[in-house]
Design a protein with these regions (language model features):
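Residue-level detector of anion-binding/catalytic polar loops
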Residues: 168
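Post-Walker A alpha-helix
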Residues: 158-159
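Conserved lysine of the Walker
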Residues: 155
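A noncatalytic interaction/capping subdomain that flanks phosphate/NTP-handling catalytic cores
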Residues: 1-151, 164-165, 175-241
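Active-site flanking residues adjacent to catalytic metal/cofactor-binding acidic residues
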Residues: 172
Length: 241
């Protein structure tokens, strides 16, 4: 297989990608773009994403965690292993490296590759004081609105309703958060709504999520003063019900 080498300068980071198949190049280059922009100096360094062909490693410890989508998680000393029937990924934050093994049958499965990259990337960012979470992120009157829930809970559907009501929806998939003492700074990966076109009523949400992925990514800052909902959890987080 042809090895595709990709190098990106993302803010304070150098990101290196090695992939075993040319078809992975587009998936990774497209997805990694959401990191573009200024990041904390403390997070500076090099992140390496290494993709290999072969049989995926399977987690086999009794303390495995399983997800509804068929992923298995296992934490070992200094690393996180996430495995699937056709691929696996291992995040090693201390080494700044994530390694993926993908079976030939899964090379063109962009959703599987994106999920593995998201999970391992989230682990590596977490160890640098950042959080990549599966959530919907919107802006309303200068405040950030974060919608969190398990897969299938209705985040995308709620996002559509929020957009139709005039809120500035940024993403219904992944949000990158940087917590500070007084605010949570958030940036979003904008992606197309997963609903069939005949189920999406004309409105702001469709146009927001359909815009080009390579545009400047939206940013929103949630300050303590802008959060006035009851049910305080821990500043600057509040629970909105």
């Amino acid at each position: 297989m042809t090895v595709a080498d990709l190098s990106h300068r993302l803010g304070e980071w150098d990101v290196e990608i090695r992939a075993p198949h040319p078809s992975i190049r587009g998936v990774l280059a497209h997805y990694i773009e959401y990191l573009e922009g200024p990041l904390p100096v403390g997070a500076a360094g090099t992140l390496r994403f290494l993709f290999e062909a072969g049989a995926p490693e399977q987690a086999g410890d009794a303390q495995d965690e399983r997800s509804a989508l068929g992923y298995r998680f296992q934490r070992r000393r200094g690393e996180l292993l996430v495995s699937h029937a056709h691929a696996s990924g291992t995040a090693r934050p201390d080494e700044g490296e994530a390694r993926f093994v993908i079976a030939d049958s899964a090379v063109r499965d962009s959703e599987l590759i994106r999920d593995l990259l998201s999970i391992t990337l989230a682990e590596m960012l977490r160890c640098r004081g950042l959080f990549a979470i599966h959530a919907a992120l919107a802006e309303y009157r200068g405040a950030g609105v974060l919608v969190i829930g398990q897969t299938g809970a209705g985040k995308s559907t709620l996002s559509l309703g929020m957009a139709e009501a005039g809120m500035g929806v940024l993403t219904d998939d992944w949000a990158l958060l940087e917590p500070t003492e007084t605010a949570i700074r958030g940036r979003a990966l904008v992606r197309t709504a997963s609903l069939p076109i005949d189920q999406v009523r004309p409105g702001a949400m469709y146009h927001v999520l359909e815009r080009r992925e390579d545009e400047a990514l939206p940013k929103v800052v949630v300050t303590r003063e802008s959060l006035r909902a009851p049910g305080e959890l821990r500043p600057p987080l509040r629970l909105v019900v």
